[in-house]
Amino acid sequence: MLKNKRNKRTWLIILLAVYLLILLRITVFRSNSYPIEMSVNLSLFTDLAATYRENGIWMVLYLVVGNIAWFVPFGFLLPMIWQKLKSFYIIPLGFLLSLVIESGQLALNKGMFEIDDLVLNTAGCAVGYLIYKIYRDFRS
């Protein structure tokens, strides 16, 4: 039983590592086919409002759902791997990961630093943690 639990944990750690590598590849270490202006947007949801005016609701939904969805695995996998990790650390760790990604995009000229992304990514981590809690309670 202990070996099976350790084996499961090992696979979850590998899954988390692969997820993080993919996330960093598509956000920070992507190749740009066009020049990106280095900028910081600290006005909450102004870019989403502009996107709505220019491209409609479907593009806004794509951006919102995408930013949330990319962080759901993080919020789910962390407590699956480290069950003793206190719940109040999960969401701040998601925020910190998002902050690292946004800062990396800015520093490497791979995208803008956007407060919207920080909020939506952190929300995605919270959704992932909520899914974990439902899963854990269901299994009990």
Regions found by a protein language model. Give the residues of each.
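Bulky hydrophobic segments
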Residues: 1-110, 115, 129-140
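Specific aromatic-rich, kink-prone transmembrane helix
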Residues: 122, 126, 130
